């Protein structure tokens, strides 16, 4: 976030990210795969994919300038799918106790060994 409250791990591929995530979880550290994040990833926005809009002219999904309909598909942004599929995000509490930091550090070290 813009207040440095998240730490992101970018792994080499989705499979590696899943292994790393499982290892972190086993060490007591929760992460979220950004591609699976329902709110912050456009391809998970059901209202977006269904072209739901409050605009009576269906803008931005229709363009009154050329009468074309814009179509969006989950496969339209493969580079984003790749990058976000291998990105794990962990929340950081700015007042995190030293004990929690130690737990996170140990979990990261053990998870790195799995790779």
Where is each model-derived feature located?
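Short beta-strand-to-loop capping motifs
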Residues: 9-13, 92-94
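Conserved PLP cofactor-binding pocket of PLP-dependent enzymes
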Residues: 21-87
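C-terminal helical cap and adjacent loop that interface with cofactors, partners, or active-site loops
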Residues: 79-101
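Conserved glycine-rich beta-strand-loop-beta hairpin in the small C-terminal domain of fold type I
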Residues: 1-10
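Short, conserved charged micro-motifs
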Residues: 14-21, 96-103
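Alpha-helix capping/termination and helix-coil
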Residues: 11, 15, 28-31
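C-terminal alpha-helix
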Residues: 107-114
């Amino acid at each position: 976030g813009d207040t440095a409250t998240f730490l992101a791990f970018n792994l080499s591929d989705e499979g590696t990210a899943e292994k790393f995530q499982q290892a972190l979880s086993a060490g007591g550290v929760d992460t979220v795969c950004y591609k699976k994040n329902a709110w912050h990833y456009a391809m998970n926005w059901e209202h977006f994919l269904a072209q739901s809009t409050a605009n009576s002219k269906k803008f931005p999904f229709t363009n009154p300038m050329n009468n074309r309909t814009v179509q969006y598909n989950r496969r339209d942004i493969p580079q984003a799918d790749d990058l976000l599929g291998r990105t794990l995000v962990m929340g950081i509490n700015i007042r995190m106790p030293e004990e929690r930091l130690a737990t996170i550090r140990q979990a990261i070290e053990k998870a790195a060994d799995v790779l």
